[in-house]
Amino acid sequence: MPARESRFDLLRLLSMYMIVCGHLVYHGIRQVLTPELEYQAFGESATGQVNFVLTQLLGLLCNVGPNVFIMITGYFLIVPRTFRSVWNKGVRLWLTIVFYGVAIYSVAALCRHTFDSRELLTQLTPIYSTTYWFMTMYMGILLLSPFLAKMAQSLSRREYQMLLGVLLVMNFGHEQMGYAFVYGSRQLFFIFIFLIGGYVRLHQPSGRWLAWTGAAYLLTCVALTGIFAVSQMMFHTTPYLHIKGLANNSAPLFTSVCLFLWFSSLPNPTSRVAHWAVRTSPYILSVYLIHEHSEVRALLWDRLIRPTEYLHDWYFLFYALGACAVVMAVCIAVDMLRKRVSSLIPPRAPHPNADAVGQR
């Protein structure tokens, strides 16, 4: 049995932590879903201005989370497997999504003493209704993976590189430049980054330059932070400092590839952290399903963690990072409990005449 590639378990854990931190920045502080609340009073003190720069850097560092998660998926699923096995995995994932959607909505409805049948229907059809945009895209990639793997296996290294080049042109976009996410191309973008992960698995890039990809990731994020922060603090035309966000298919595409390549070049760690990452790997997706549920999101960022109340405190960054770690730990613990309880349910007994029927 081949040794487990624990560096990718660690990267999967890190990428989900980045997703949670990114949600703190863009949901908890910037309030991207409620633009009328976009005002952030960073500029009212020197400490607040420092925290603005740190928050902008945190947002850009964590912008890569979804991309890296899909690249990891591509790395492991680029090996051909039957559609039946992938379908079964997709069904189990769909049932988990429905479970959390319905359970969380039911608890919220009981607390509010209100019930909306249309909202319940939305929770029962999470993929079709795109309740979770990321999970909708992930499910599509999962079901397409056997066919993408067969295609990738049939390509030479050069052909694979040309395919990635074409997909880069078709998917890269920044503001008014490029295709961006139009005409339903977000799924095409996920196919692109899935195939990037697959390319690393099949063709294993090598060379001394890989050791510098981690530095390229950090320096690019620092440079972008400097550009965004300095331009606003010196030349801003609005009364508030605005946290800049970037689409996953612009600069974060480059930084996510850099981070993924750097991790792929590392030896598999054997530390306690890596061991914990391996143990928690089956529960990582539950972090997204729980904390990003529409009923949990506002409660989490606006009423429990409330990051905007700490913008002028010196410990703001430590508080934000610690709060996100607690969110992850709680979500993982909840899913561990769910699986423990479900394991206590006895399996369905086979029909007494099943063997006889099978022999006919």
Please name every model-derived segment:
Residues 207-286, 292-303, 307-320:
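Alpha-helical transmembrane segments and terminal signal-anchor/GPI-anchor hydrophobic tails
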Residues 53-66, 122-137, 175-193, 226-258, ...:
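Interfacial loop-to-helix transition and helix-capping segments at the boundaries
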Residues 96-101, 193-195, 282-289:
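Small-residue-rich segments of transmembrane alpha-helices in multi-pass membrane proteins
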Residues 141-150, 194-205, 255-271:
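Alpha-helical transmembrane segments in multipass membrane proteins, preferentially the mid-helix core
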Residues 159-206:
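Loop-centered beta-sheet repeat module
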Residues 17-24, 100-106, 164-177, 217-232, ...:
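Aromatic-anchored segments of alpha-helical transmembrane domains
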Residues 70-78, 193-200, 287-289:
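Hydrophobic transmembrane alpha-helices of secondary-active transporters
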Residues 1-167, 270-273, 303-360:
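Membrane-cytosol interface segments of multi-pass membrane proteins
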